[in-house]
């Protein structure tokens, strides 16, 4: 994430917080990104600096005017006018980071060798919420190279309980013992 994305995303969050709109803008920001992801030609158009700023901002007005919070629309226009629309996802990341921080939410990614059944997913989420004392947003990834167990990735921390990690630890210990 660039410094510009941190500053812009943080500024949008500060404004939303001041106006009591953090949840609405968070939701709409995610929806706008999903729309742009689903319309790559439109997304490229908004980022094309050879197209006049007024034309790109007008396209934003036509597509989103009255459908999203005016502060969010103005934020998107500022990105468009400054030629920094490509940083929207980074701005959204910073907004989400600040939102999560203020709402005691922690994002955790769990990687397993096979897909976890829904009961195990809920049990893991409940256990993490108890341990961390925060609301947990848990995402899951399947990676057969884990061989078993679970790898948990939290902000600034990784807890590796995979079979692959254990085998690597045993191999390293054997290698050091043989020397």
Model-derived features with residue positions:
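Elongated, mostly alpha-helical coiled-coil "stalk/stator" tethers of large membrane protein machines
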Residues: 1-179
């Amino acid at each position: 994430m660039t410094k510009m994305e941190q500053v812009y995303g943080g500024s949008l969050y500060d404004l939303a917080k001041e106006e009591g709109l953090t949840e609405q803008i968070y939701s709409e920001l995610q929806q706008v990104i999903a729309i742009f992801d689903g319309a790559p030609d439109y997304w490229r158009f908004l980022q094309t600096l050879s197209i006049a700023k007024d034309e790109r901002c007008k396209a934003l007005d036509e597509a989103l005017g009255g459908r999203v919070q005016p502060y969010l629309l103005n934020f998107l226009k500022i990105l468009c006018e400054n030629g920094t629309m490509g940083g929207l996802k980074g701005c959204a990341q910073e907004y989400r980071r600040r939102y999560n921080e203020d709402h005691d939410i922690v994002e955790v990614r769990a990687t397993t060798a096979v897909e976890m059944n829904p009961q195990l997913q809920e049990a893991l989420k409940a256990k993490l919420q108890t341990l961390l004392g925060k609301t947990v947003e848990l995402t899951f990834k399947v990676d057969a190279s884990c061989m078993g167990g679970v790898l948990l990735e939290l902000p600034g921390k990784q807890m590796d309980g995979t079979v692959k990690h254990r085998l690597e630890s045993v191999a390293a210990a054997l290698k050091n013992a043989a020397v």
